[in-house]
A protein has these predicted regions:
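Feature captures the FAD/FMN-dependent oxidoreductase FAD-binding
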Residues: 1-4
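Glycine-rich loop(s) and the adjacent beta-strand/alpha-helix scaffold that form part
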Residues: 7-82
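Hydrophobic, well-ordered secondary-structure elements that form the walls
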Residues: 25, 167, 201
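Generic structural signal for well-ordered, non-membrane alpha-helical segments
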Residues: 29, 160, 190-194, 198
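Non-transmembrane alpha-helical segments in soluble domains
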Residues: 34-38, 198, 202-205
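FAD cofactor-binding and catalytic pocket of flavoenzymes
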Residues: 52-191, 221, 225-227
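Extended C-terminal subregions enriched in glycine
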Residues: 56-60, 194, 202, 206
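Flavin (FAD/FMN) cofactor-binding core of flavoprotein oxidoreductases
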Residues: 208-229
Length: 229
């Protein structure tokens, strides 16, 4: 393979500059680290047809599902109070911490209920069936903001040969570099694992005092989609 001896970048005037270095650290997050190596000619890009190459092979991330618990008006969650990531985590269903007999999957994940300071843009809990905007949405948000708790499931993501990263043969960025292309779908193993975790989280939510309704979302379910970058 090749050895990185520095970094080429564009300065504020758009001029190409080479900065030599004895050590080059990749610190652009996993996806962009892979892209940097690919456009720099470092390593062999994975070819799914032949199975050769390691760069971009077996891309995996995390498998997300969640429960929203809506409480009666006498039960207050006060989402604006907390330390940013204050909460409790159940680790009983992570990895090999539980018996997988007849479950049909390997892996697992943690189940967590936490407070993130009720961030005004990120935290907008409304019951299922609420319109996405308008007066009814505002009314629902006002009524549920202080009577809601979220429970999230962060599950494992098993690597498969069908999930990988490579360079797009068509699309390029403003500087002429090929864009990163992701080929990914949840394997059946992860779908089963996520459904199992979600059932456990929903069970916890239903047994909370004061809960009047719950809703669930499984991002790995068949037909579901979300940004995994």
């Amino acid at each position: 393979g090749k050895t990185a001896t520095g970094v080429t970048y564009l300065d504020a005037q758009g001029r190409e500059v080479f900065q030599p270095a004895d050590v080059v650290c990749l610190g652009a997050y996993a996806l962009w680290n892979v892209q940097l190596m690919m456009v720099s000619g470092l390593g062999q890009i994975y070819d799914p047809a032949t199975g050769e190459g390691t760069l971009g092979r077996n891309y995996s991330y995390q498998t997300i599902a969640a429960v929203s618990a809506y409480f009666d008006e006498d039960t207050w969650s006060n989402p604006f109070i907390g330390a940013g990531a204050l909460g409790m985590t159940v680790d009983d269903y992570n990895g090999d911490n539980f018996d997988h007999t007849d479950l049909g999957f390997v892996g697992g994940g943690y189940i967590s209920a936490n407070q993130t300071n009720g961030r005004p843009i990120n935290y907008q809990p409304v019951p299922p069936g609420t319109p996405g905007w308008g007066a009814e949405w505002k009314r629902a948000l006002r009524d549920t903001y202080q009577h809601h708790v979220g429970i999230v499931c962060h599950g494992s993501s098993m690597s498969t040969r069908a999930n990988y990263l490579d360079l797009d043969p068509t699309w390029r960025d403003a500087y002429g570099q090929p864009l990163m292309r992701m080929t990914f779908d949840f394997p059946e193993n992860d779908r089963r694992m996520s459904a199992f975790l979600l059932d456990r989280a929903a069970e916890i939510a239903r047994n909370m005092d004061g809960v009047r309704e719950i809703s669930t979302v499984n991002r790995a379910a068949e037909g579901a989609a979300y940004s995994i970058v």
